[in-house]
């Protein structure tokens, strides 16, 4: 497999090295991240169906709604930092089903919640207890089932663990990649015991980290390197010019090739895909610049590839349920927007109740969102926006 990938990378280098401005007749997209693209405006509702789910609020169900997973029937949330141990299960109408808290020092408990993966078919929650280098598995009632220990050199605290198939989780080791502990950052781990099932190797010559550090502090772009794509997975390794697609049968192929080569840039500019639809590929470029005193940086450019027009644009997307032109972040919104690209859902995003109450009072909402906001107050749980693929 490693030999095949290396040969593929060489072929891609030869192809992209003599690239013109026109998209080639290949199975992968080529993106010049230094180009000045024409502007394009899109209306979210023109290409996705949007549903709003107000979360039930009562004494038991009060949450900041950090979104962890969504299934056909359930929404899984935790509070913002995951330190209080609360896990909230809502149904797809927003009605609270169960609140679970198994925090503690016992062998069947967790000390923190880095993230949660849902296997809805088996009725299992995988709690990323990363301080202890383990996943703890519970049923949907919070009953302990098993513990999956993983190597202490791994660190999945970025929360990028997902349900890959019936037997495995797919994980991204962000800290290990940042510290250059190993060549690969993408792994399949067994749902039964946490053992390594497969190391997903991507070819590159030198490790290039998107992180910057100064005086013991580190900063990174926090875009998503592991993205679902309707059963397959998009893998972003910052050290290589090729973004790959990884399938359920473990085959791997080029998905996007960026130019110019990452090794030729200073500072580096990285490319991250995000929401993927039948027509549009949303992407974002992020420059490796950060001011540690002002805590600002990583300037971004929002792009979209329109497959129908076979062209790339700089893009802004508006939510038509707001009277004013209100942009929707389709690319990066850490802790607020969660990319799904699976099971008919493109993404989910939380809308804070106090912001909706204010917008409602100013007459800035319309349609179903306006109706929901009329029944909210500033202490109400957030509203979950679910953007679904059109049937």
Range-by-range predicted roles:
Residues 15-17:
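C-terminal motif of bacterial Sec signal peptides marking the signal peptidase cleavage site
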Residues 32, 50-85:
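Beta-strand-rich domains and repeat architectures in extracellular enzymes and scaffolds
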Residues 65-70, 114-120, 160-166, 213-230, ...:
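Structural signature of eukaryotic scaffold interfaces centered on beta-propeller domains
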Residues 112-113, 130-183, 198-211:
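Asp-box/WD-like beta-propeller blade repeats and closely related beta-sheet repeat scaffolds
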Residues 254-271, 308-341, 357:
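Conserved blade-ending motifs and adjacent loop-strand segments that build the rim/top face
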């Amino acid at each position: 497999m490693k030999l095949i990938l290396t040969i593929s990378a060489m072929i891609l280098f030869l192809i992209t090295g003599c690239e013109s401005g026109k998209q080639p007749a290949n199975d992968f997209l080529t993106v010049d991240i230094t180009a000045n693209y024409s502007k394009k405006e899109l209306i979210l509702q023109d290409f996705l169906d949007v549903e709003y789910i107000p979360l039930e609020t009562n004494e038991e169900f009060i949450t900041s709604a950090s979104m962890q997973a969504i299934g056909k029937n359930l929404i899984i949330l935790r509070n913002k930092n995951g330190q209080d141990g609360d896990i909230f299960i809502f149904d797809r109408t927003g009605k609270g089903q169960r609140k679970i808290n198994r925090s503690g020092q016992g062998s069947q408990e967790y000390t923190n919640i880095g993230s949660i993966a849902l296997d809805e078919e088996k009725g299992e929650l995988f709690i990323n207890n990363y301080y202890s280098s383990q996943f703890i598995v519970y049923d949907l009632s919070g009953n302990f089932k098993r513990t999956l220990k993983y190597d202490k050199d791994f660190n999945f605290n970025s929360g990028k663990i997902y349900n890959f198939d019936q037997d495995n989780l797919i994980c991204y080791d962000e800290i290990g990649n940042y510290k250059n502990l190993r060549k690969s950052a993408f792994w399949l781990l067994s749902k039964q015991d946490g053992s390594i099932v497969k190391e997903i190797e991507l070819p590159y010559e030198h490790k290039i980290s998107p992180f910057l550090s100064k005086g013991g502090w580190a900063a990174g772009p926090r875009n998503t390197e592991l993205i679902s794509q309707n059963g397959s997975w998009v893998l972003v390794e910052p050290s290589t010019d090729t973004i790959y697609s990884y399938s359920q049968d473990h085959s791997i192929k080029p998905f996007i090739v960026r130019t110019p080569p990452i090794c030729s840039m200073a500072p580096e500019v990285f490319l991250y895909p995000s929401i993927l639809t039948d027509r549009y590929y949303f992407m974002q470029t992020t420059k490796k610049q950060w001011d540690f005193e002002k805590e600002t940086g990583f300037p971004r450019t929002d792009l979209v590839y329109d497959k129908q027009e076979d062209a790339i644009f700089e893009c802004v997307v508006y939510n038509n349920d707001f009277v004013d032109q209100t942009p929707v972040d389709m690319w990066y919104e850490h802790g607020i927007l969660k990319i799904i690209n699976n099971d008919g859902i493109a993404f989910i995003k939380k809308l804070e109740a106090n912001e909706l109450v204010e917008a409602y009072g100013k007459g800035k909402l319309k349609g179903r969102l306006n109706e929901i906001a009329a029944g909210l107050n500033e202490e109400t749980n957030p509203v979950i926006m679910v953007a679904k693929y059109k049937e």
